[in-house]
Amino acid sequence: DNSVTDDLPYLTFNDEYKMPKVGASVLVVHLSNGSAMGIVAGTYWNSSHRPPVSGKGVYRKDLAQAIGEAFLQYSGGSLQIHAPAITLDASRITLATKSGSITAAEIINHIKG
């Protein structure tokens, strides 16, 4: 019916923030006191807005507006972190596998010789 409301608040999950793109389809929950009041619950997948991956045991979180630009993806026991650049800022970083572990400081010391 082409009706338009004033700006609506956006529901967050655990204080995360990712505003939908202008023109994106969103689910709006209208309050019982009138259709002008409501909350934007978020975007949803549909035939024109499909998820980049799907399947049993797949978890993916896109972090940028462009799908595939930056994301976390978990499937089959493997976590993929994809981004144009990644910065780890910590007092200690350890890489660990079944065969052993090494800290970032040890790697840097080895490179410096």
Label for each model-derived stretch:
Residues D1-T5, F71-Y74:
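Short intrinsically disordered, low-complexity coil segments enriched in acidic
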Residues N2-K18:
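Beta-strand/loop nucleic-acid-binding surfaces
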Residues Y17-S25, H30-G113:
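Right-handed beta-helix
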